[in-house]
Amino acid sequence: MSAVPHDSATHPPVVCLLGPTASGKTAAALALAADAPVEIISLDSALVYREMDIGTAKPTREELAAAPHHLIDIIDPADSYSAAQFVTDAERLIAQIRARGHVPLIVGGTMLYYKALTQGLNDLPQADAALRAELDQLAAERGWPALHAMLAEVDPVTAARLAPNDAQRIQRALEIHRLSGQPMSALLARQAEGRTFAGAADQRFRVIALEPSDRLALHARIAQRYDAMLANGFIEEVERLRRRGDLHPGLPSIRCVGYRQVWEYLDGDADFATMRERGIAATRQLCKRQLTWLRSTPERLVVDCLAPGYVDQVRRLADFGH
């Protein structure tokens, strides 16, 4: 799939407001909505799920009412949503928003979706439900670090960049190796060597990246936000999801940061303090991955998300008021 097409003669750049968790993306996006008839396209693999509001830090009703939002609450937690689906949806939405005379604004931190939209998708094997179930069962018996060790034997390059408990990525890398007989790292390297993205030359994005000047300060903000989620009913939200009876920790929805840790707590596998510590640590790890992806995006315009006037700087860079 190619990058989203764009006619630079008739349309300004698609502004993308990217940043790690807890970097203030929502506040900045709503400030931009005050400058222009903005419609926000969510770039967040967790916000797509219905019934998952607190642990995903979903925008409030008031925030959602301040500007049209898209790709939030679009699928059931029992279902999955892929980068390919995001590209299809985002391409359609960009065209529709522009046809209405409005301004598309892409906001979020799921960098895989951003890369797929702007650079195209790779041709790796499709997901195999039976194989994933087999790997989930193996992980339940032996633990994800054991599967990480298995991955290191067949694809050391990929294993070296994954944490031993990064279940979703370990599973995907093992799945690709089992289905193709080749390491995922080798497949991606070959595709990168020969890839030319149709539309990449004439597609213009203005990428504004919210990055912290002090990572420890962002870590403190992450801990405060996680504690606020717990105080606002996060555990009760996960309890409601468990009562449905059709959800389990192997699903992408329940693997979302925070949800897996609370699920384990409700299973009796951790006490409250351990659950809290693991949830905050997992969020920090997510933040680190997001920043790593962002810093590999040379076209980005960096804004210090901890600076008092960061919203005003975002507004100047987006240039919606002109």
Swiss-Prot record:
Catalysed reaction, written as an equation: adenosine(37) in tRNA + dimethylallyl diphosphate = N(6)-dimethylallyladenosine(37) in tRNA + diphosphate
Gene Ontology BP annotations: tRNA modification
Chain positions of site Interaction with substrate tRNA: T110, R132
InterPro entries: Dimethylallyltransferase (IPR039657), IPT (IPR018022), P-loop_NTPase (IPR027417)
Region (Interaction with substrate tRNA): 44-47, 168-172, 255-260
Known EC number: 2.5.1.75
Residues that coordinate or bind substrate: T21, A22, S23, G24, K25, T26
Gene Ontology molecular-function annotations: ATP binding; tRNA dimethylallyltransferase activity
Keywords from the UniProt entry: ATP-binding, Magnesium, Nucleotide-binding, Transferase, tRNA processing
Positions with a binding annotation for ATP: G19, P20, T21, A22, S23, G24, K25, T26
Cofactor(s) the protein needs: Mg(2+)
Stated family: Belongs to the IPP transferase family.
HAMAP family: IPP_trans (MF_00185)
Described function: Catalyzes the transfer of a dimethylallyl group onto the adenine at position 37 in tRNAs that read codons beginning with uridine, leading to the formation of N6-(dimethylallyl)adenosine (i(6)A).
Assembly notes: Monomer.
Name used for this protein in its record: tRNA dimethylallyltransferase
Species of the source: Cupriavidus necator (strain ATCC 17699 / DSM 428 / KCTC 22496 / NCIMB 10442 / H16 / Stanier 337)
Gene: miaA
